[in-house]
């Protein structure tokens, strides 16, 4: 029965970092810590990686 606890703990530790990379950026602080800017429409050299709290203000990062 202890092997179940060990397996559960191992899977929890193994899969927990993946959740951080799948979250959507939805505030200005997270956008800026990822090296991006909050802007209306993204310029051509940038790509959208999220939004900055409002659907019209996008989080744009250079390609």
Curated annotation (Swiss-Prot):
Disulphide connectivity of cysteines: 31-59, 38-52, 42-60
Tissues expressed in: Tongue, esophagus and trachea.
Family matches, as Pfam families: Defensin_beta
Keyword annotations: Antibiotic, Antimicrobial, Defensin, Disulfide bond, Pyrrolidone carboxylic acid, Secreted, Signal
Signal peptide stretch: 1-22
Subcellular location: Secreted
InterPro entries: Defensin_beta-like
Gene Ontology molecular-function annotations: CCR6 chemokine receptor binding
Main location: secreted
Bilayer-spanning residue ranges: none
One GO-annotated biological process of the protein: chemotaxis
Modified residues (Pyrrolidone carboxylic acid): 23
GO cellular component: a single term: extracellular space
Protein family per UniProt: Belongs to the beta-defensin family.
Protein function: Exhibits antimicrobial activity against Gram-negative bacteria and Gram-positive bacteria. May act as a ligand for C-C chemokine receptor CCR6. Can bind to mouse (but not human) CCR6 and induce chemotactic activity of CCR6-expressing cells.
Name of this chain's protein: Beta-defensin 4
Species per Swiss-Prot/TrEMBL record: Mus musculus
């Amino acid at each position: 029965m202890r092997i179940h606890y060990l397996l559960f703990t191992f899977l929890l530790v193994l899969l927990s970092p993946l959740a951080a990379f799948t979250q959507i950026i939805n505030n200005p602080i997270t956008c800026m810590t990822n090296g991006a800017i909050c802007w209306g429409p993204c310029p051509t050299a940038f790509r959208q990686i999220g939004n900055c709290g409002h659907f019209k203000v996008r989080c744009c990062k250079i390609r």
